Amino acid sequence: MCLPTIKAFKTILDAGSHRATQLVPLKKLKAEFQLKSDIYVKLEYLNISGSLEDRAAHRAFEMSNGIQRGDEVYVTAGGSSAVSYATVAAVKGVRLTAHAPPGAFDQVRTILSTLGTKIVELPVSNFREARLQADLLAKRRGVYNLDGICEKAAFLANLEGTAPEIEKAGKTSAVVVPLDAGGASAAAGIAAYFLKDQKTTVVGVRSSASASASAPAPETEVLLQKYKVEIRDAPESYTFTRHLIETEGIMAGPSSGAAVLEAIKLAKDLPAGSVVVVVLMDGIRDYLDADWMKVNGKKPIKPREIFDPKVLDYDPTKMVGEWKSSSKFRPERPLVLDSVLDAIGKTPLVKLQHVPKAHGVRCNVYVKCEFLNAGGSTKDRIAKKMVEIAEKTGKPGALTPGATTLIEPTSGNTGIGLSLVAAVRGYKCLITMPEKMSKEKSTTLSVLGSTIVRTPNEAAFNSPSSHIGVALRLKHEIPGAVILDQYCNPGNPLAHYEETAEEILWDMGDRKIDLVVLGAGTGGTITGISRKIHERRPNAIVVGVDPNGSILTGPTTGPAPDFYEVEGIGYDFIPGTLDEKSVDSWLKSDDKESFLMAREIIRTEGILCGGSSGCAVHYALEQCRKLDLPEDANVVVLLPDGIRNYLTKFLDDDWMKARGFL
């Protein structure tokens, strides 16, 4: 294979602006509603900060002439829209203040704070009044106000970006767009693009569901009329949105659910063979605390108190079977996918521009943004691979849609990945997870339709009350249950050997790779990536990071903590999927440094990463200094997941202060 020149992105904004969002057909809903037309959804929640508004925010800053790093800027925006503007501001080093009516920041307050955005709730009843007050404040202080160009930016971003992507995907009869937040300008821009052939209808759906709902500016209403956007009012659609998530694995927010429901109604009136595209406004991140997200109708489940001790006869330190690569590598996601599972992999590699220099590091540091996988983490890869192997070979158990229950002990992300795969493939899913794992993970699992069983943090892996022990007991009680077992399944390292490592090598092109730094949990990530990197770049050094309190690298030197807060890395046993010989050296990590680094990456690079990502980057920089890597050296760090799972944890100042981290 001929490698390209380096394809890593200069900033996370470049990754967003140069990567189209994919379209996915709703096959199950088509059958359920007996439609003769096809409905596709455009996955705008896989943009860099999670919504369609990313396009408008980036364009608005491009259109704002004269804004320099360090300048103060105002914008009127709430919810996911505010997060989009805050992300761009973080990358550009701009001091952003977001204004909005009361309540508009409720679900995104910690995100905005971590991004460094100041928020001001104005004593007004709607966004139009907020824009007027913000404009007066900006003029009084001599501050640049983006409000004057936001609507135009959204119009142009969707006219020149979203609409051509839809057209490129194929013939479209109708496009449905939520009108919440900047959706009205987006709908107008898309309609303006398709007006040229008058064969595509654009429908705007008004819904009260969005956390960032705002009335469009008067000039936008004129554009909606000018470009013949058909307006429909949608009823409450929370129940349907849950159904969309559980049925198709489309992790969309409520205004997007309302738009899909309207698309179904529209499709019934269209000729057979028509195509309707729904532009999804945002994902589930900003709604995880909403009541509609928490009720999935699953009855609580516990294993029987009395059980045969033989069910615990299990050794997670031995891998079951060998693994070898057989698949062909595809470097990019196609524009149209077969299912949302095809939006797993091909995540962007981004160069850090500010953090390394701030910590005395001269070399190039690139981060692989795994939070842009379909389910939000690198564990999506192994979930998909393990299910594919089981479907093909019947190992470790035969899978039957509608009958099989997938059971998995996990720290959360593998469970989310498996829940996503189970939703699409038609399996039931039960996740056992320690109590310390975030409530956001639990809610995400719930909305995907999984049953969750929590277990004590202090239970050792071989205890009957641990997440592993409970999973083993439940497997023997539930007919047709299968544990795919990430600790022993060869599909775990294989996914990273075949895909993740290949993507890193492709994106680095003909550049040398001096150092790769990876956090270790089950060990599948580091084993798979390390083997492939060593095969193709034998001079590269692969370093694993393991938290104090974990034993993956042996006992901690000095007093070991009984508990560590960073999720997704470390264990109290050596999993069978970890090949210790594939790792050149190990570093021990602490919680405080990990979380502070994650917050710094978010604030200065605009990369919305999780705590284990901060852990990997902090200790990568430490290793860079130790090795005294020169300016032309290249370092790659994997960011396993994003902020969605930690909104009430390390993003929250009170949580950090309570643990002595701030």
From Swiss-Prot:
Cellular component GO terms held in the UniProt record: cytoplasm
Protein's UniProt name: Putative cystathionine beta-synthase cbs-2
Listed Gene3D superfamilies: 3.40.50.1100
Entry's Gene Ontology molecular function annotations: cystathionine beta-synthase activity
The protein's role, per its UniProt record: Putative hydro-lyase catalyzing the first step of the transsulfuration pathway, where the hydroxyl group of L-serine is displaced by L-homocysteine in a beta-replacement reaction to form L-cystathionine, the precursor of L-cysteine. Required for inter-sister DNA repair during meiosis. May play a role in promoting apoptosis in the germline in response to endogenous and exogenous DNA damage. Dispensable for survival in response to atmospheric hydrogen sulfide or hydrogen cyanide.
Tissue spec: Expressed at a high level.
InterPro entries in UniProt: Cys_Synth/Cystath_Beta-Synth, TrpB-like_PALP, TrpB-like_PALP_sf
Disulfide bond annotation, renumbered to this chain: none
Protein family according to the UniProt entry: Belongs to the cysteine synthase/cystathionine beta-synthase family.
Catalysed reactions, semicolon-separated: L-homocysteine + L-serine = L,L-cystathionine + H2O
UniProt pathway: Amino-acid biosynthesis; L-cysteine biosynthesis; L-cysteine from L-homocysteine and L-serine: step 1/2
EC top class, as a word: lyase
Binding site residues for pyridoxal 5'-phosphate: N413, G521, T522, G523, G524, T525, S612
Main location per the UniProt record: cytoplasm
Names of required cofactors: pyridoxal 5'-phosphate
Quaternary assembly: Monomer.
Source organism (scientific name): Caenorhabditis elegans
Alphabetical UniProt keywords: Amino-acid biosynthesis, Cysteine biosynthesis, Cytoplasm, DNA damage, Lyase, Pyridoxal phosphate
